[in-house]
Amino acid sequence: MLICVPGILSKDDVAEFRHIMAESDWEDGRSTAGAQSAMVKRNEQLPPDSEVARRLGHRIISAMTANPRFLAAAIPQQIFPPLFNRYAADAGHQFGIHVDNAVRGDKLTGLRIRTDLSVTLFLSEPDEYDGGELVIEDLYGSHEVKLPAGDLVLYPASSLHMVTPVTRGVRVASFFWLQSMIRDPLARSMIFDLDTTIQGLSQRMGRDDPEMVRLTGLYHNLIRYWAET
């Protein structure tokens, strides 16, 4: 399940983030990579324990958890503190094909999560850079993702994926992982489809329609059956 969520950050928010990040110190992105990923990772990151990364990360989490589409798709239990990276054409930055670690730990908070979903929040507009597509592989082939600044994409952390070489400009993004209350990806996908259907039908039938009430009850009972808290 690959889901795009538009407008997590406003354009003004993105501009503010970019200004703050431009004045910050960056480090080799391999500092947070696993052994296999480090061999193919070429980018820069804000230090994960920096005040800037933590402050901006809190703002992203606040914005995401107020977004109905994100909540419906992810059903988040725990969210890893957002990280920030940049890929510059003049440095030959790219990130070769890899899969994310199954478990991530945060040294500052002691948080450990199972990485069910990966998240990329774009902080550069598509016309600011060439290349830099996020390429995600699944059973149906390869999918290229390059979204407007402020939009994010959710995809299974178990997916092979890569960031193609940036050949012009600079690509800036936030990336992180989350553990969902619905561990099984098929169950999570069905819950999302059901939620989307309920939202569409409720606009035509009204939320107080008896069939809508029954359908909403089914939604909550399925979450009750599958959820891990």
UniProtKB/Swiss-Prot annotation:
Keywords: Dioxygenase, Iron, Metal-binding, Oxidoreductase, Vitamin C. SMART domains: P4Hc. InterPro entries: Oxoglu/Fe-dep_dioxygenase_dom, PKHD_C, PKHD_hydroxylase, Pro_4_hyd_alph, Pro_4_hyd_alph_FE2OG_OXY. 2-oxoglutarate binds at R171. Its cofactor is Fe(2+); L-ascorbate. Its EC number is 1.14.11.-. Residues 78-180 form the Fe2OG dioxygenase domain. This is PKHD-type hydroxylase BRADO6316. It comes from Bradyrhizobium sp. (strain ORS 278).
